[in-house]
């Protein structure tokens, strides 16, 4: 996964609360066996409405989603994060995230930045007053900048570290490859073991 330090992109105001993972990507789109190509399913039931924000310019080119409270609740669905990223989002800002969504986001490289609800509403207002407004998320400083407005955001230290280092679960495991290989080399031959597939 690519390391995340800062990202600047067009802000997209999603004035909806309690957006669950089934609304982010309906189950019918989960049949792929790959980890990419889910952008068509993102907010699929809402995108059929021509007035939905992602159907409007310049928001259709946005990469910073500003959502209402309780974003990403519901079932554990990594595909929700993948769909957002496949569409082009790198940051989601909300006052509250579903716990599992927040964890999946950090493991995939999507920044889930938690700001106050007043902060979310201020960002909505700024974006709607100036469509195309660019928003910058700075993970090192843990702040969101929109024009002259600077808002702090919360993220747990471990997730911030993983994002800054670009460590998904596999990369995190590979940091201990020497210890894993030493363990495997010392493992008795008479015990059951797995063998690599040729």
Swiss-Prot record:
Pathway: Amino-acid biosynthesis; L-leucine biosynthesis; L-leucine from 3-methyl-2-oxobutanoate: step 2/4. InterPro entries: 3-IsopropMal_deHydase_ssu, Aconitase/3IPM_dehydase_swvl, AconitaseA/IPMdHydase_ssu_swvl, IPMI_Swivel, LeuD. It catalyses: (2R,3S)-3-isopropylmalate = (2S)-2-isopropylmalate. GO terms for cellular component: 3-isopropylmalate dehydratase complex. It is an enzyme of class 4 (lyase). Keywords: Amino-acid biosynthesis, Branched-chain amino acid biosynthesis, Leucine biosynthesis, Lyase. One of its GO terms (molecular function) is 3-isopropylmalate dehydratase activity. GO terms for biological process: L-leucine biosynthetic process. Its EC number is 4.2.1.33. CDD domains: IPMI_Swivel. Catalyzes the isomerization between 2-isopropylmalate and 3-isopropylmalate, via the formation of 2-isopropylmaleate. Heterodimer of LeuC and LeuD. Belongs to the LeuD family. LeuD type 1 subfamily. PANTHER family: 3-ISOPROPYLMALATE DEHYDRATASE SMALL SUBUNIT, 3-ISOPROPYLMALATE DEHYDRATASE SMALL SUBUNIT 2-RELATED-RELATED. This is 3-isopropylmalate dehydratase small subunit. The gene is leuD.
């Amino acid at each position: 996964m690519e390391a995340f330090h800062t990202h600047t992109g067009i802000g997209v105001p999603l004035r909806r609360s309690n957006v669950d993972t089934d609304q982010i990507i309906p189950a019918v789109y989960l049949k792929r066996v790959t980890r990419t190509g889910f952008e068509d399913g993102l907010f699929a039931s809402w995108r059929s409405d021509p007035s939905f924000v992602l159907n409007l310019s310049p928001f259709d080119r946005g990469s910073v989603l500003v959502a209402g409270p309780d974003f990403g609740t519901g079932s554990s669905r990594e595909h929700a994060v993948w769909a957002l990223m496949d569409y082009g989002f790198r940051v989601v800002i909300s006052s509250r995230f579903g716990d599992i969504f927040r964890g999946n986001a950090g493991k995939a490289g999507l920044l889930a930045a938690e700001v106050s609800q007043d902060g979310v509403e201020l960002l909505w207002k700024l974006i709607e007053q100036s469509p195309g407004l660019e928003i910058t998320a700075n993970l090192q400083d843990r702040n969101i900048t929109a024009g002259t407005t600077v808002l702090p955001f919360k993220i747990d230290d471990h997730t911030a570290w993983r994002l800054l280092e670009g460590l998904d679960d596999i990369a995190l495991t590979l940091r201990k490859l020497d210890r894993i290989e030493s363990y495997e080399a010392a493992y008795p031959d008479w015990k059951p073991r797995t063998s690599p597939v040729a």
